């Protein structure tokens, strides 16, 4: 393994990854700390959907977003652990998507447009696995 200096775009992509995953953490915290008043203000179909999310799906959400933040931080401090952490995060994403698309009525509630963000999250999660592996191959991560 070499100790090559990362290209500038490595830092840009890593910083974007951290911001993206931090937004996921904010969404997670907003969901799990939603007040009864905020929940009641939602349309009934959205409220019922949120209240029906099983604990394991919420845990998958937590693993996905916190794993993404940790993986991004590991990229920024140039550690090879980034790739395995992103893989765990990706598994959380997959579990969440399986629940949303196949075990709940989220598509009925949000419409086909509601599939866009989860698919973007899935694609970006896969990209971060690839990116962290390439960074390791390039000797940018130790």
Model-derived features: positions:
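Topology signature of small-to-medium multi-pass alpha-helical membrane proteins
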Residues: 1-142
